[in-house]
C-alpha cells in the first residue's frame, strides 16, 4: 500500500448524508490513494457501513459484544489521536458522526480544524489498511508507505 497526503488536506466538508454508494473492498483500498487531499465523506460512509455490518453480526451471532476487527482497528487509531476521546460512532437520526469525550457527545463538525484533520487523516489511513488486509486478525499489522507533506500542518500534537 502506498498513500500520499499533500498540504491541502484540511477537512472542509463533514457530510450530513450519503449521496452515492461506494463499494468497499480490498481492491478499492487504493482508490484515489495518490490524490493530494482527504475525503472525509468516503471515511464516514465506510465507517457507517462497517457499523451496520457489525450490528448485523451481533444479531446473527447473538453476541452483543462482537466487534468487527476492521472497524475496531479504525476506532482505536482514530481515538488514539484525539485527547480525552472515549468513543467514535455514527448516529442515525439525524445522520452524523460523533465523538464521546468526558461522557459528552460532540458532532465531528464541532471539533477544531486540527482535530477534524487528524481524525480524517488517521481514519483514512486505518480504513485503507483495514480494507487491504481483510483476512488478518489485526488488519493494522499490514505494511505500507505513507507520505504526508508538512506533517504538522493542521495537526494537533
Regions found by a protein language model. Give the residues of each.
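Coupling/switch segment of ABC-type P-loop NTPase heads
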Residues: 1-79
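A structural signal for short, well-ordered beta-strand segments and their strand-loop junctions
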Residues: 3-6, 87-90, 98
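A generic secondary-structure boundary signal that marks alpha-helix termini
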Residues: 14, 83, 127-131
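Short coil/turn segments at secondary-structure boundaries
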Residues: 17, 90-93
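Short secondary-structure junctions
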Residues: 79-86
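Switch/communication elements of ASCE P-loop NTPase nucleotide-binding domains
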Residues: 92, 96-157
Amino acid at each position: 500500500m502506498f498513500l500520499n497526503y499533500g498540504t491541502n488536506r484540511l477537512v472542509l466538508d463533514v457530510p450530513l448524508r450519503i449521496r452515492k454508494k461506494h463499494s468497499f473492498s480490498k481492491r478499492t483500498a487504493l482508490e484515489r490513494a495518490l490524490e493530494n487531499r482527504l475525503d472525509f465523506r468516503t471515511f464516514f460512509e465506510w465507517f457507517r457501513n462497517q457499523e451496520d455490518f457489525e450490528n448485523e453480526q451481533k444479531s446473527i451471532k447473538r453476541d452483543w459484544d462482537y466487534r468487527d476487527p476492521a472497524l475496531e482497528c479504525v476506532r482505536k487509531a482514530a481515538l488514539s489521536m484525539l485527547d480525552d476521546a472515549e468513543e467514535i460512532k455514527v448516529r442515525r437520526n439525524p445522520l452524523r458522526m460523533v465523538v464521546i469525550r468526558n461522557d459528552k457527545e460532540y458532532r465531528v463538525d464541532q471539533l477544531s480544524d486540527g482535530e477534524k484533520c487528524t481524525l480524517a487523516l488517521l481514519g483514512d489511513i486505518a480504513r485503507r489498511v483495514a480494507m487491504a488486509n481483510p483476512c488478518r486478525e489485526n488488519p493494522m499489522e499490514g505494511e505500507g508507505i505513507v507520505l504526508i507533506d508538512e506533517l504538522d500542518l493542521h495537526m494537533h500534537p
